[in-house]
Every structure is written in C-alpha cells, then in structure tokens.
Design a protein with these regions (language model features):
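Acidic, polar-rich low-complexity tracts and alpha-helical solenoid repeat scaffolds
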Residues: 2-5, 23-288
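A periodicity- and composition-biased signal for non-globular, repetitive helical segments
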Residues: 14-15, 128
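Enrichment for repetitive, rod-forming helical segments
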Residues: 15-16, 91
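C-terminal motif of bacterial Sec signal peptides marking the signal peptidase cleavage site
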Residues: 18-22
C-alpha cells in the first residue's frame, strides 16, 4: 500500500469512528454538518464498521458499550464471519464489565456454534473465568467454586495444548485449595466450640479429599488436637506420625509434637482405622 493509500485508509477509519460515536442504544445516530440532521439506524452500517466501533469503546474502557456493538453484529449479521468474531469479543467485553452471566452466555454460544474454531479454547476459558473471578472469599457460597472447577477442568481436558491450559491448571489448584479452606474454616468453628466429632469429620475431608492442598498440614494438626481432647490417643499419635512423615519442617508438626509429648505420647502409628490406612499409603508413597 502506498503512503497516500495508508493516509486515505486512516482518514476513512477515523471518519467511521466519528460517525458511529454518536450512536445511541436505540441503534440510531444523528448526523449534522452540511446535511440536515437525520437519524441513521445502525443497520445502515457494515459489520466491520460496527466492529471497529466496539473496539473503539473497549479502548475507551467502556466494555458495556463495546458489548452492545458486538451484540448488534450478531443480531444484524448472523452466521457471518463478523458475527463469529464479534461473539467472542462480546464474551470478553461482558467479562471486562463484570457482567458474568452475559459473558458466560456469549462464551457458551461461541462454543456451541464454533466448537472447532481456534478461539473455542479461549471461549471455554472465559466461561470458566466467569465463575472463577467471583470466588473472592472463603466464607462465600461454594457453589461457584464447584462450577469453576468443573469449567476449568473442561478447559484443561478439551484443550490441553492451548495457551490457556496452564493458566486453567493454576486456577484449578487455587479453586481446589479454596474448597479445602472452607472445610477448615468450619472445622475450626466446631473445634473452638468443643464439638470434636463434627470438627474431626471436616478435617478428615481435607486429609482424604484435599490432601494436595496447602491446608493438609494444619488439618492433621487439628486432628491431633481433637483426638487428644476426646482421649483417642491412638488416632492422635497416628495423625502426628503422618504429619511428621510428610511435613516435619512445619510449625504444625512442631505444635503437634509438643501436644503429644506433653501427654507422654509419641507421633507414631498406633492401631488401625482410617488414619492407619493413610499412614500405610504414605509409607508406600501412595499418599500425597
């Protein structure tokens, strides 16, 4: 392209952005200048013009307006290549606006309509993020966390070679850790109120189902506390033995060691039960 051609293209794009700048949410705009003022419907524009307007709104940090224009392309030019491109941008724009239900809906439509497209992996990743980005604190309802885990797992399994797989794996681990944190929070609540059996049930879930998370050492220590409080020394010693075998350098093991030795006990496997089974798995390298 010649220099004159490049300038002409730049002028044309600038004019299109200015022309669309006055577009309102009722799909019309007002023109002025040497012409009489008139309303021009959005339908009068080509899809690439509307698409550029959407990009313009994104650059202005107005994702809600951007999503509107991208959605209009899907409405006005369905089944076109511009509709395909606009749909993934619509999902992205809604996500930027923290409109997670609409982002998820747009991403799911993209996956349904274009399952083999290069952007399908990104659509699935956006769908997962629509759940994941709402996980903000341990005390929140865990339904979103389960949905995030499911969507992230699908991203990893369906698109293992995509550029989003690694990020999905990291977020999956964090969401998994979040669920374990919820169990720990409830377990501590019961432990403080001396509801030892209820507390043990929560800590057991962490040890059995979330053993790869960062909460496992504390869960084992809390089991030592709870079992000692109930006078169940065999289980307390076995929990301490598992803790010492896997996390000997942690303060949780040091605290458990002090508790056990303070009662003349040692952190060693004693008896059978569920902790005894885990200890045997630990020795064989089958646990954690």
């Amino acid at each position: 392209m010649t220099r004159i051609g490049s300038v002409q293209k730049a002028i044309l794009i600038g004019c299109m952005c200015c022309a669309l700048a006055a577009c309102s949410r009722d799909s019309t705009r007002t023109t002025g200048g040497i012409f009489n003022q008139q309303e021009v419907p959005l339908e009068a524009y080509q899809p690439e013009q509307i698409y550029e307007r959407g990009e313009f709104e994104l650059n202005r940090n107005r994702p809600d307006d951007a999503a509107f224009y991208f959605a209009e392309i899907e409405r006005l030019y369905p089944y076109s290549d511009w509709a395909r491109r606009a749909l993934i941008m619509q999902a992205f724009s809604y996500h930027q606006d923290q409109d997670y239900p609409n982002s998820r809906s747009a991403a799911q439509r993209f996956i349904d309509f274009y399952p083999d497209d290069d952007d399908a992996a990104y659509a699935q990743y956006l769908l997962a993020l629509s759940y994941y980005d709402q996980i903000d604190e341990v005390g929140r309802d865990q339904g979103l966390t389960f949905q995030a885990l499911q969507a992230l797992r699908e991203t990893i399994e369906r698109y293992p070679d995509s550029e989003y797989a690694r990020s999905a794996i990291l977020k999956f681990d964090l969401a998994f850790d979040h669920l374990a944190g919820k169990e720990m929070e409830i377990g501590r609540y019961y432990l403080r109120r001396e509801h030892y059996t209820a507390a043990i049930n929560r800590f057991r879930v962490v040890v059995e189902d979330f053993q790869t998370t960062s909460h496992t050492p504390e869960a084992l220590h809390r089991l030592v506390e709870a079992y000692l409080s109930l006078g169940l020394t065999d289980q307390a010693q076995t929990a301490g033995a598992i803790l010492g075998f896997n996390y000997q350098s942690t303060t949780w093991y040091q605290d458990s060691f002090v508790l056990l030795t303070g009662q003349g006990l040692r952190p060693e496997p004693t008896g059978d039960g569920w902790l005894g089974q885990i200890y045997r798995q630990t020795i064989k390298g089958e646990w954690i």
